Structure formats: structure tokens, C-alpha cells
A protein has these predicted regions:
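Short pre-active-site segment immediately N-terminal to redox-active cysteine/selenocysteine motifs
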Residues: 55-57, 61-65, 127
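Thiol-/selenol-based redox modules, centered on thioredoxin-like
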Residues: 133-164
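Short, internal strand/loop/helix patches
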Residues: 90, 101-137
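N-terminal "domain-start" segment that seeds a small globular fold
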Residues: 20-49
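Positively charged n-region of N-terminal signal peptides that target proteins for export
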Residues: 1-5
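Hydrophobic membrane-insertion alpha-helices, especially the h-region
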Residues: 8-21
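Short alpha-helix adjacent to the SAM-binding motif of class I
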Residues: 71, 78, 98-106
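Conserved redox-active cysteine motifs that mediate thiol-disulfide chemistry
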Residues: 61-78
């Protein structure tokens, strides 16, 4: 093998590793114990996610400036009463309480809005929306970075089945 071929192979390997790193950082939801997150409600009072044990729960990490987050929350709002009536939705941000309340009051979504006491980066959430589904035992049964098409009937059925 020539030096040029070895050099090309090394460059391809390095680029592949960089690609894998970026994919894992931005497209794979970090493993986390969602029910033990430190969060506060819109009045800055601590909120215990454990209190939702026994209920199916969608935990959506969002930001008020994120178009895909807003789109996903809008879709969840549209289908909540008809198709997700037995599911609680937690909308969690790392923005200020003021921004949380402005967004909450503007959108009027029937979700529980919470603020992290840490930043997304501290939790290794590098891309939003990031969604976790919890079953009735409070266990994470699904996680995804990026927009979920909740209007797709087969996707919705699959995700609801996971929460059972």
C-alpha cells in the first residue's frame, strides 16, 4: 500500500468517527432517569415526576424558540383529548420561568409545563425536541431526538402500545 492510500484510509476513518460522534451527540437521546429529574412548575415550586406513577406520560423537552418543538406540542394538543386522553404530557424546558410562563400563556396547551433546575447540556440533551415515553411504572420505554409525527396512526398506535 502506498502512503497516499494509507493517508486516504486514515482520513476516511477519522471522518467516519467524527460522523458517528456527531450522530450520537445530536440524534440519540441520552439515557436518563426521567422520574428523578429536578424540576419546578410554572410558579417555581418543586414538582415530583414520581407523582405521575401509574399514568402513561409523554415527557417532551422543548424550547420556546424551537420550531419543531412548537410543531410537536401543537400536534400533541390537537390529538390529546381524542387519542391521548389517558396520557399526561410534561413539557420541560431549561429556559427561564418568565419565558416558560410567556410561552405557556400564549399557547394555552393543556400540559404540565416544567423548568429544569439544570441546563439541557448538563443532562446531555444537545438537540430538541427530545421525547421520552414513560409507562405506568414510570419506566422509560421509548426515547427520541427530533420531531415525532403523532398524526401518523401507525406511529401513534406503536407509541401508545409501548406505554401500556
Amino acid at each position: 500500500m502506498t502512503k497516499k492510500q494509507i493517508y486516504n484510509i486514515l482520513i476516511i476513518a477519522v471522518l467516519g468517527l467524527i460522523g458517528l460522534y456527531l450522530f450520537n451527540k445530536y440524534k440519540v437521546a441520552p439515557k436518563m432517569d426521567v422520574v428523578n429529574l429536578s424540576v419546578v412548575d410554572s410558579t417555581s415550586k418543586p414538582f415530583d415526576i414520581h407523582s405521575l406513577k401509574g399514568k402513561k406520560t409523554i415527557v417532551a423537552f422543548y424550547a420556546s424558540w424551537c420550531p419543531d418543538c412548537i410543531k410537536e406540542l401543537h400536534v400533541l394538543n390537537e390529538i390529546k383529548n381524542e387519542k391521548l386522553n389517558d396520557v399526561d404530557v410534561l413539557a420541560i424546558t431549561d429556559e427561564t420561568i418568565e419565558k416558560l410562563n410567556t410561552f405557556k400563556n400564549k399557547k394555552q396547551f393543556p400540559f404540565t409545563f416544567l423548568k429544569l433546575t439544570k441546563s439541557f447540556n448538563e443532562l446531555k440533551i444537545f438537540s430538541i425536541p427530545t421525547v421520552y415515553l414513560l409507562n405506568t411504572k414510570g419506566e422509560v420505554v421509548y426515547q427520541k431526538v427530533g420531531y415525532i409525527n403523532w398524526k401518523d396512526e401507525s406511529e401513534l398506535l406503536h407509541l401508545k402500545t409501548l406505554m401500556d
